[in-house]
Amino acid sequence: MINRQLSRLLLCSILGSTTLISGCALVRKDSAPHQQLKPEQIKLADDIHLASSGWPQAQWWKQLNDPQLDALIQRTLSGSHTLAEAKLREEKAQSQADLLDAGSQLQVAALGMLNRQRVSANGFLSPYAMDAPALGMDGPYYTEATVGLFAGLDLDLWGVHRSAVTAAIGAHNAALAETAAVELSLTTGVAQLYYSMQASYQMLDLLEQTRDVIDYAVKAHQSKVAHGLEAQVPFHGARAQILAVDKQIAAVKGQITETRESLRALIGAGASDMPEIKPVALPRVQTGIPATLSYELLARRPDLQAMRWYVQASLDQVDSARALFYPSFDIKAFFGLDSIHLDTLFKKTSRQFNFIPGLKLPLFDGGRLNANLEGTRAASNMMIERYNQSVLNAVRDVAVNGTRLQTLNDEREMQAERVEATRFTQRAAEAAYQRGLTSRLQATEARLPVLAEEMSLLMLDSRRVIQSIQLMKSLGSGYQAAPVVEKK
């Protein structure tokens, strides 16, 4: 007897093992994941030589010591609709991860049901259609009642749901990094617009000084014409100059208005609550990039962090797609009361218990699982290639912005010498006028070349400030990867 039972148990074990092995669908084609760029490949070309400096600090704008800029950025971070949208994407990604995680947990539900029915005299339950109280049948009408608890659990032995949850958590981490990228874009955008506006204020001041000089020349030539001391050609030439300057002044004023409106939209200000922006001097620019990039650039660029998390999530999705080829197991159970008579529903004899283990074997699916795996793998490899290109683009941004800033610094040094040279000429003209060697008009007009060179210097300074902010942005502007969100 015992040997027979052991034989049956052995036979069941062999059949069960054979069923599990044969129950796995065949993976016809699955390519290897594409390679990601190695950190040692993340470096600048050998012929790019820039001053060495540390990484930007968090809240980098505070180092500029500009209260107006501080207030604008704080208002942007607290009231930007773009940033609010990014934070809502965080919440959406979190809820998606929670939803998938909840689906892999034990599910328990209370069940209550009433079923008023008439039993067919010709069906499978035809005996219950009789009206025979002695036999416990008072058909053909019955009111069946069921109350109890229903539970279900997917055992997820191969990690179908587990990998899907991990992928969703990766997408949530990516959303966190994307929010940081939005903050970075907003802060640098506000700073660039703010200093563009400050440069326009200074340009307007230089143009108005230029206009004053030319206006004096117009009046001087007009007086000479009125006294018959010279022809009208110099007078009309000066008039043409002043009209050209007026045109430039109008253009700069329009540029200030456009910049202000762009800034208004970025900080989320309304038509009547835009803060007044007073003129201040442009800040001094610090030139330089870190000595090495490598891992640090990956960790300090929020867009690269987001891409890295999307790559990891795509690999987890591939794992989930592969796990679908294996048998799945689940357990369902019911415990409660069931009776075809309401008056006996809550009696001890109405208790019912069901225990239903389930097994699903993916034998024939018409290629659905392979197509799903192939598509998921292709999407993952696409994400890896996009990530690799993003890393290369990030290195390019650092190299290009750093080189441009260094070039602007060199140009600024030469332009500063030109300004000093024209100032020397102006001082010489002033000295000659003081000694009575030249007229006051000539001494005054000697100021025009100085103003022209100062405008060129101002444009270089403005471009340097904007470029330095762009370089900080390409270096992450003080971003540090946030702590990883893990499964609760």
From Swiss-Prot:
SUPFAM superfamilies: Outer membrane efflux proteins (OEP). GO terms for biological process: response to antibiotic. Residues 1-23 form the signal peptide. InterPro entries: OMF (IPR050737), OMP_efflux (IPR003423), RND_efflux_OM_lipoprot_NodT (IPR010131). A lipid is attached at C24 (N-palmitoyl cysteine). The keyword Ubl conjugation does not apply. It comes from the Bacteria. A lipid is attached at C24 (S-diacylglycerol cysteine). Its main location: membrane. GO terms for molecular function: efflux transmembrane transporter activity. It is found in: Cell outer membrane. GO terms for cellular component: cell outer membrane. Keywords: Antibiotic resistance, Cell outer membrane, Lipoprotein, Membrane, Palmitate, Signal, Transmembrane, Transmembrane beta strand. The keyword Nucleotide-binding does not apply. Gene3D superfamilies: Outer membrane efflux proteins (OEP). It is a lipid-anchor. Could be part of a tripartite efflux system composed of MdtN, MdtO and MdtP. Belongs to the outer membrane factor (OMF) (TC 1.B.17) family. This is Multidrug resistance outer membrane protein MdtP. The lineage of its organism: Bacteria, Pseudomonadati, Pseudomonadota, Gammaproteobacteria, Enterobacterales. The gene is mdtP.
